[in-house]
């Protein structure tokens, strides 16, 4: 049996909670652990420096600074630029530690032994240092929990995790599946090589080919544009896999922001996507199934879950030594 959309019980794990909406007087606390939150801290430090002298990053807007620029500044850059990045890492780590402690007070999180840190900020040395510093802060405060960076590149983990939405029997005789990772800035679709002969637990699964659409950079994009792009891209990926004799399982796994209902609709949390994805009249899995009813000779099965859950699922093969973990 294949899980329903947004299911709590999946083939390898049970999802106690996701899309946690913990608020304080500044809003949702989870927003303060994002890549954007780190840049906000950098900008505040730069503002202080501009009042009293030169900005070591010049005229470049904080939102335009790349992860490589942060890494270079910390490793070999101007001493004041390094100081800004180091200060931002410290402030961010303190904030992340507070957020994790707040989450651990929740019933669903209280027995968590390990937390996997993903997201776009993870894919840099500065991000790894921030994770390490947060771990030190928590342990020094007596919080017994392990923090680890996500193994795969975050952009790929969101696709690889899609393979864990379906039972492994569905993949017998097949080489790969289709995965979709939907975000407020980008949408990705790709072919995930399952590599089951190398690792039946999917620990060797990898992205064989993928396409990216930076929809946030375009004007007047709506949800119909997103569906059209996905359908066209999935058909291209199916053709590419067929050309290379890579046998696709009749399955599409989707990671999407928000609270996912069993019928594939989105209750809330999709406000950053183009158009109104929370409408009761919009159902992405049904639309994709209508456009791609079969993959090869088999009927297409589609499962959609929250994007953070799907990214976290890419770590499932490496979590067998703990009972409860989060991401």
Residue ranges: model-predicted function:
Residues 2-37, 64-115, 119-138, 147-158:
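Helical "lid/coupling" subdomains associated with nucleotide-phosphate turnover
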Residues 5-83, 182-232, 236, 240, ...:
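Short glycine-rich, Thr/Ser-proximal phosphate-binding strand/loop in the N-terminal lobe
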Residues 116-117, 179-181, 254:
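Short beta-strand segments enriched in small/hydrophobic residues
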Residues 123-155, 211-228, 246-252, 258-324:
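Glycine-rich phosphate-binding loop and adjoining helix at the ATP-binding site
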Residues 100-114, 230-252, 292-296:
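Phosphate/pyrophosphate-binding loops at sites that engage ATP/ADP/AMP, CoA/4′-phosphopantetheine
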Residues 1-32, 160-197, 262-327:
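Phosphate-binding/catalytic loop of phosphoryl-transfer enzymes
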Residues 89-101, 159, 227-238, 310:
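Short, hydrophobic/amphipathic alpha-helical packing segments
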